[in-house]
């Protein structure tokens, strides 16, 4: 495990909107680069790969991904205390109001809502958006391509990424077949754990 204490003597500040799996990848990378990281999310976050997402902290109070711990906080002062412990602060703050107190050097919108949920290029010295919904040079400084394929992770400094197709990327020859959609509203009780081997028709 890398000792971050020396890096943290000259730390910069990053605010990540969202705390799902992709947002967590961003947050972890920034943490390892020496940034203090605050992640914001909605009160009931939806996460595809929740075992590797800081969004679990919203439900459980804390989450750990690759040895890096995220702690749920309720205020900016609590967030500062968590940052002093060299951990990531996670806060329920859908509009990222904490940005006004935190004054981040970098803001990354990793909500993946397929549209801009209020992020502005003036929110921080450097503002980056993930996926469709952003225009580099207009509402953000840069956009990261999230569409699977040869352009994945391309950095766009002028213009937009590939539009949302509504169809997930192909994995093993399957796209829409990889999704299970609920037939109605309600609470889901899982019958298998993430990582379990399942068979077609099992559920």
Language-model segments: which ranges?
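Well-ordered secondary-structure scaffolds
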Residues: 2-203
């Amino acid at each position: 495990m890398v000792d971050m204490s020396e890096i943290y003597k000259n730390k910069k500040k990053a605010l990540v909107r969202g705390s799902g799996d992709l947002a967590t990848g961003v947050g972890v990378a920034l943490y390892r680069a020496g940034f203090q990281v605050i992640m914001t999310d909605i009160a009931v976050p939806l996460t595809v790969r929740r075992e590797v997402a800081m969004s679990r902290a919203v439900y459980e109070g804390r989450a750990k991904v690759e040895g890096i711990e995220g702690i749920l906080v309720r205020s900016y002062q609590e967030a500062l205390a968590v940052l002093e412990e060299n951990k990531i602060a996670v806060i329920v703050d859908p509009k990222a109001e904490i940005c006004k107190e935190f004054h981040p050097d970098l803001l990354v919108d990793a909500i993946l809502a397929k549209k801009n949920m209020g992020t502005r290029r003036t929110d921080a010295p450097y503002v980056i958006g993930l996926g469709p919904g952003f225009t580099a040079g207009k509402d953000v400084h840069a956009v990261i391509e999230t569409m699977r394929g040869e352009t994945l992770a391309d950095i766009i400094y002028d213009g937009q990424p590939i539009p949302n197709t509504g169809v997930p990327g192909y994995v093993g020859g399957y796209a829409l077949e990889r999704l299970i959609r609920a037939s109605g509203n309600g609470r889901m009780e899982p019958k298998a754990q993430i990582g379990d081997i399942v068979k077609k028709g099992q559920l």
